[in-house]
Amino acid sequence: MDAPHSKAALDSINELPENILLELFTHVPARQLLLNCRLVCSLWRDLIDLMTLWKRKCLREGFITKDWDQPVADWKIFYFLRSLHRNLLRNPCAEEDMFAWQIDFNGGDRWKVESLPGAHGTDFPDPKVKKYFVTSYEMCLKSQLVDLVAEGYWEELLDTFRPDIVVKDWFAARADCGCTYQLKVQLASADYFVLASFEPPPVTIQQWNNATWTEVSYTFSDYPRGVRYILFQHGGRDTQYWAGWYGPRVTNSSIVVSPKMTRNQASSEAQPGQKHGQEEAAQSPYRAVVQIF
């Protein structure tokens, strides 16, 4: 004769405490949560819509640490942006010669790839970077056009949440030759109308400099709605008009789409046991999120 059970078996997984269900959901891939689990019942839908779940998933997948103290406007959007987080520029460190770059101007002896530190140069701050692009005695410019939708950033995300777009570039001169470096970054609409731009004045470095690598960084925030493309262009020329490759050296360029870190009214985190759904109904991103899968 079987021993009597001390507690009756659960008739349904929904009888589990909501905290336990939330913990289970942190182990489920986001694709299944949105396309399958969220459709099972209203309880699952409301739990999956909780900011608390997506914060836990961020912690579990290493997007944040336990001591994270920065405010986040929307943990769901934060999660998906971190999932997509990468450098949108291809071949930024010249490892594949000129692959992926559009040559806009190829003056003098043209663009060339060299290995660090190069003649009369210095080591790059990051030892993982091994090569750089170098310009000549007439203008050399190269560019890439990034298609944000093709890279997985859906239109509703770009227009409603407008995540930060962080642009970085590194440049240096040879110690024995002066040069001029320039950078232009433009945010453009679907029909290539420029909506925002960053184009600082050209930087001129004098001859007999210390050849130090310099980082340029700029963040596009609260830009106009409608951004679909990013144009990145950089280059320059030497100032001595010497044959060969004595112009500015560039490498380790990057464009990264990052979550905003400012809390707003959409950032409330309802806890298990509270009423769900109301705080997220106004701007639920799920209809558009599934497009990334």
From Swiss-Prot:
Pfam family, one: F-box-like
GO cellular component: cytoplasm; cytosol; endoplasmic reticulum quality control compartment; SCF ubiquitin ligase complex
Polar residues biased stretches: 261-271
PROSITE patterns: FBA, FBOX
Region of interest called Disordered, as start-end residue ranges on this chain: 261-285
Domain FBA positions: 78-259
Ranges for domain F-box: 10-57
Residues recorded with modification Phosphoserine: S258, S284
Entry keyword set: Cytoplasm, DNA damage, DNA repair, Phosphoprotein, Ubl conjugation pathway, Unfolded protein response
Localization annotation: Cytoplasm
Origin: domain of life: Eukaryota
One GO biological process term: DNA damage checkpoint signaling
The protein's assembly and partners: Interacts with VCP. Part of a SCF (SKP1-cullin-F-box) protein ligase complex. Interacts with CHEK1 and CUL1.
Known function: Substrate-recognition component of some SCF (SKP1-CUL1-F-box protein)-type E3 ubiquitin ligase complexes. Involved in endoplasmic reticulum-associated degradation pathway (ERAD) for misfolded lumenal proteins by recognizing and binding sugar chains on unfolded glycoproteins that are retrotranslocated into the cytosol and promoting their ubiquitination and subsequent degradation. Able to recognize and bind denatured glycoproteins, which are modified with not only high-mannose but also complex-type oligosaccharides. Also recognizes sulfated glycans.
Name of the protein described by the UniProt record: F-box only protein 6
Organism, scientific name: Homo sapiens (Human)
